[in-house]
UniProtKB/Swiss-Prot annotation:
Upper classification of the organism: Bacteria, Pseudomonadati, Pseudomonadota, Gammaproteobacteria, Enterobacterales
Family to which this protein belongs: Belongs to the IPP isomerase type 1 family.
Domain Nudix hydrolase residues, every copy: 30-164
Name by which UniProt lists this protein: Isopentenyl-diphosphate Delta-isomerase
Enzymatic class: isomerase
GO cellular component, one term: cytoplasm
One of the GO biological process terms: isoprenoid biosynthetic process
Positions annotated as active site in the UniProt record: C67, E116
Keywords: Cytoplasm, Isomerase, Isoprene biosynthesis, Magnesium, Manganese, Metal-binding
Subunit and interaction comment: Homodimer.
Species this protein is from: Escherichia coli (strain SMS-3-5 / SECEC)
Length: 182
């Protein structure tokens, strides 16, 4: 895969430039555009993934299915499709917006900061997973209710963005509705 970049944003969310992805994530990460996706199977189960230990931020942490950064000229939806192919080896249904105005800042235990405007999407797949070990070290298909209960009971066991997304009542309601429509 070619070198990825992030689209830098000002405080109003207007693009101001780009920066190489690895260089962008530091202790002083600038605000940039990202996306987060929750992927469901035909049974309505959520794919929860564990980030590879080689990841710069939050290595080994359990999180939602796929996250990434749209590239210049690429829609968020196309970026979700691209990253699902790259990380999971799957084709998906057109991504549906779940939490379009999600924005967060969090610092991992190593001091790496995520600072993102990060619209959240949900999609489905019926494909068999072909996991990219550079991105994902483990995964599990789970009932959404069990995952949400786990997040509520042990938020420290999940990525901060997943916890924050699940804490939004409207996003939680939309994810639950999405999971039930098999």
């Amino acid at each position: 895969m070619q070198t990825e970049h992030v689209i830098l944003l000002n405080a109003q969310g207007v693009p101001t430039g780009t920066l190489e992805k690895y260089a962008a994530h530091t202790a002083d990460t600038l605000l940039h555009l990202a996306f987060s996706s929750w992927l469901f199977n035909a049974k309505g189960q959520l794919l929860v993934t564990r980030r590879a230990l080689s990841k710069k931020a939050w290595p080994g942490v359990w999180t939602n299915s796929v996250c990434g950064h749209p590239q210049l000229g690429e829609s968020n939806e196309d970026a979700v499709i691209r990253r699902c192919r790259y990380e999971l080896g799957v084709e998906i249904t057109p991504p549906e917006s779940i939490y379009p105005d999600f924005r967060y800042r969090a610092t991992d235990p190593n001091g790496i900061v995520e600072n993102e405007v990060c619209p959240v999407f949900a999609a489905r797949t019926t494909s068999a997973l072909q996991i990219n070990d550079d991105e994902v070290m483990d995964y599990q298909w789970c009932d959404l209710a069990d995952v949400l209960h786990g997040i509520d009971a042990t938020p420290w066991a999940f990525s901060p963005w997943m916890v924050m997304q699940a804490a939004n009542s409207e996003a939680r309601k939309l994810l639950s509705a999405f999971a039930q429509h098999n």
